[in-house]
Amino acid sequence: MIYAGILAGGTGTRMGISNLPKQFLELGDRPILIHTIEKFVLEPSIEKIVVGVHGDWVSHAEDLVDKYLPLYKERIIITKGGADRNTSIKKIIEAIDAYRPLTPEDIVVTHDSVRPFITLRMIQDNIQLAQNHDAVDTVVEAVDTIVESTNGQFITDIPNRAHLYQGQTPQTFRCKDFVDLYGSLSDEEKEILTDACKIFVIKGKDVALAKGEYSNLKITTVTDLKIAKSMIEKD
């Protein structure tokens, strides 16, 4: 089975424009989270869309689904997320297992709730690549020169941009593989390895690159929200 896992566990209100976490802010005529879920509803191969939300916001998320996506709510599961990204993925997988016991071939397409401009093509590419690889990471080519500084004051290296990519989401992999690999990490490794695909890489698994889009914006600042609103208005 193919599942979607939407990471919506953040509680930050650092934009300073609302008491709502950013995934619940309005973008056009509906919340950012709803825009994101709608993109996954369009892919018929996805059995369930599981949304990991902070415990304080589960009821709010359920109300939004009832209001904006009543025809699709049977395909959507709202569950309590974890304390961080990877524990939220683990909670999402636990919710999948509760719905239907996991098999070794079950795949989860994980995605940031605040990336509402994901395309159906990106979702389908992730699913297709995951059939033949251990994991998939969605990326775009780096367009700016990246500099490295080990002390925050002076440049220590300027890597070759031709070999660099900017990571986005979705990130896609088999549910059981993630659970096994995450479970094999020490507590110290769990603190450091906050990116799911990095866990696969350091464990020697093959992680394929899926082509992202520069429009696959992650809305984390007021400027991002302004850009997103202008993108919605153009559509």
Swiss-Prot record:
The record marks 161, 218 as: Positions ribitol 5-phosphate for the nucleophilic attack. It catalyses: D-ribitol 5-phosphate + CTP + H(+) = CDP-L-ribitol + diphosphate. GO terms for biological process: cell wall organization; isoprenoid biosynthetic process; poly(ribitol phosphate) teichoic acid biosynthetic process. It is an enzyme of class 2 (transferase). GO terms for molecular function: 2-C-methyl-D-erythritol 4-phosphate cytidylyltransferase activity; D-ribitol-5-phosphate cytidylyltransferase activity. Its EC number is 2.7.7.40. This is Ribitol-5-phosphate cytidylyltransferase. It comes from Streptococcus pneumoniae (strain Hungary19A-6). The lineage of its organism: Bacteria, Bacillati, Bacillota, Bacilli, Lactobacillales.
